[in-house]
Amino acid sequence: VTAPGTLVERIDAAWTALGPQEQRVAGFLRARPDESALYNAAELARRTGVSKATVSRTFQRLGFAGAQEARDLLRAQRGAGLPVVVDDPDDAVAAQASRDAANVQRLAAETDRAALDAAAHAVAVARQVVVLGFRSGFPVAMLLRQALVQARPDVRLVPEHGQTLGEELVGLGADDVVVVVGLRRRPASFDDVLRALDTAPSRTLLLADPSLGPTPADWRFDAAIESASPFDSYAAPLALVSALAGRVLAGLDGAGAARVAAVRAAYADLGELGA
């Protein structure tokens, strides 16, 4: 019988077959799946008050060869975007800053400057720009739209709360650009959206991370989101958004600067922004 995928699923499936001591170990693992990636069998035995043999037997009943295989599964879950701790740095802020810096440096090394300029030019001269983001990609898309709308008009963010997407994609023309932000843990419909855009006359600019396989798009740029914490980091995607928006503004020359000035004046007239 094939064991269920995650550690918690395996525990739930095997719970009634476990003895009292084994349930003590399994209960600890179920309550602290993040920590489970940190401990070997001896440490788990110490923390649960059972023997090392009991810990080993528990893992076997859960379908693992041993504690290391369970830790490997947790690391794989983290690679799929699930929040699982894989290390325990003494200085979490320093560890995260180091990881973020590495992700941004990777972005700088791997981004095709000519392609970025071409994509930025297309965004600058498009009739309208539609910025599309799902789940964790939505706040990144929102920040991109916020930057672009200060540089040029007719920039829409979709889907808004309560919206469906179909009506937003109808009527796109060859002089429109759709910017899609698709980061790890994308919705199941994500590939369908890209295929629909591939058949549309508009052009598609995809901002993704390396976990996404080959996809149809006129331009694609990847930003790593690996993290020192249990959750993905968006330092590199946000750096990519900033670089893209900056190139768009630069490509608009005087028109972009004039719009920025007009937006700034509107903020002042409305008293919307503080210092």
Q: What residues fall within each predicted segment?
A:
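Short, low-complexity, intrinsically disordered N-terminal peptides in bacterial proteins
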Residues: V1-E9, L270-A275
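Internal, active-site/partner-interface "lid" segment
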Residues: G251-A275
